[in-house]
């Protein structure tokens, strides 16, 4: 049992419905890993979205997610997903079983940019 907690992999699928609050897309809460050096992979299954990333220096960038796209999230990088389409958006993830999650950092300080719809397109806007 314990060896899988230390050396295993977790897999998960997330579903995000389309929509916005104001002009900000529906998104996941976002997190760093508790074991900050742990990486993660995301891949698109259905619909379209954006992977929003922020390093420990609070630099923010985004990558377009679509069915079949594969994305590497290095250790030390916070991440969240947003549904930028008009249909259900789903993606899969794989991460080390000892990565843990640190949601508190994002809850307390947020991301340094927001993904908003501007002129009908997703755009990162610094805060």
Regions inferred by a protein language model and the residue ranges of each:
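Short acidic-hydrophobic catalytic motif
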Residues: 8
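Double-stranded beta-helix
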Residues: 82-127
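A short secondary-structure junction signal
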Residues: 25-28, 53-56, 61-62, 83-84, ...
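Short, conserved beta-strand element in jelly-roll/cupin
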Residues: 16, 35-55
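Conserved short histidine dyad/triad with adjacent acidic residue
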Residues: 13-37
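Short acidic-glycine-tyrosine-enriched beta hairpin
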Residues: 56-74
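Histidine-centered metal-chelating micro-motifs
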Residues: 50, 70-71, 75-80, 100-101
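Short, small-residue-biased leader/transition segments that mark boundaries at the very start
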Residues: 3-4
């Amino acid at each position: 049992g314990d060896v899988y907690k230390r050396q295993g992999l977790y897999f998960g699928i997330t579903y995000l419905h389309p929509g916005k609050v104001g002009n900000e897309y529906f998104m996941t809460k976002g997190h760093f890993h508790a074991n900050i050096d742990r990486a993660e992979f995301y891949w698109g299954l259905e619909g379209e979205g954006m992977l929003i990333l922020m390093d420990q220096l609070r630099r923010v960038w985004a990558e377009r997610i679509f069915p079949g796209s594969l994305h590497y999230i290095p250790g030390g990088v916070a991440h969240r997903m947003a549904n930028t389409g008009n249909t259900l958006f789903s993606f899969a993830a794989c991460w080390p079983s000892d990565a843990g999650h640190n949601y508190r950092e994002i809850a307390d300080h947020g991301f340094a940019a927001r993904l908003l719809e501007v002129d009908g397109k997703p755009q990162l806007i610094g805060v």
